[in-house]
């Protein structure tokens, strides 16, 4: 799958807009940067709320339906279910973890890319993997880190330089190497856009 989003070109030397320069790249070349769009958690909340109203559910009912998508896995693991407040909290603070976002997207039948601000409409190129009741969709964070680090080295970027491009801190990026559970969905989506790959390349049906 190669669902690549639009890009922008930065010429050097003599670029007028210094904010669009890529740090730590040789000055005698043209660098093409992907157009990196933020993940709109507010729009995700609105989509959840619209479907909730359509089905006549309370937020507790939505959380229950989301959790029951992995009913067989839940019976085996006895994990703590997703809380309704995890869903409703996005109304006031429009952000969510990358793993929780997958639970919500699975229930909606939507792709992560369909919630990029000003991004593409939902498209089969970006479809998430199928998962049965014995699986839960999860981000493969180690694979995401390895792919990011490989491209960073190829592009000759330091961690601070890449962090500047992705509008985050270097530790947020390097921390993915040992992350046990999740990072923010916005950061995960910024990384996959920079890689020029669909989020689905880094999502798998997990047994946890």
Model-derived features: positions:
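Short alpha-helical DNA-recognition segment
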Residues: 56-88, 153-175
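Residue-level detection of the helix-turn-helix DNA-binding "recognition helix"
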Residues: 67, 92, 178-180, 207
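Short, basic-rich loop-to-helix N-cap that marks the start of a DNA-contacting helix
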Residues: 81-86, 92-106, 180-193
């Amino acid at each position: 799958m190669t669902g690549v989003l639009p890009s922008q070109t930065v010429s050097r030397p003599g670029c007028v807009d210094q904010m669009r320069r890529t740090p730590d790249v040789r000055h005698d070349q043209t660098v093409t940067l992907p157009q990196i769009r933020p993940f709109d958690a507010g729009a995700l909340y609105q989509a959840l709320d619209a479907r909730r109203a359509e089905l006549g559910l309370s937020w507790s009912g939505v959380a229950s339906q989301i959790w029951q998508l992995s009913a067989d896995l839940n019976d085996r693991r006895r994990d703590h279910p997703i809380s309704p407040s995890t869903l409703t909290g996005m109304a006031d603070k429009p952000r969510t973890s990358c793993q929780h976002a997958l639970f919500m997207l699975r229930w909606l039948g939507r792709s992560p890319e369909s919630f990029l601000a000003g991004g593409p409409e939902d498209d089969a190129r970006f479809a998430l993997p199928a998962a049965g009741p014995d699986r839960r969709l999860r981000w493969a964070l180690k694979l995401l880190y390895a792919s990011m680090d490989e491209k960073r080295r190829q592009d000759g970027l330091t961690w601070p330089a890449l962090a500047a491009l992705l509008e985050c801190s270097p530790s947020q990026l390097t921390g993915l190497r040992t992350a046990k559970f999740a990072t923010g969905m916005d950061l995960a989506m910024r990384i996959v856009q920079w890689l020029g790959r669909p989020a689905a390349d880094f999502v798998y049906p997990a047994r946890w």
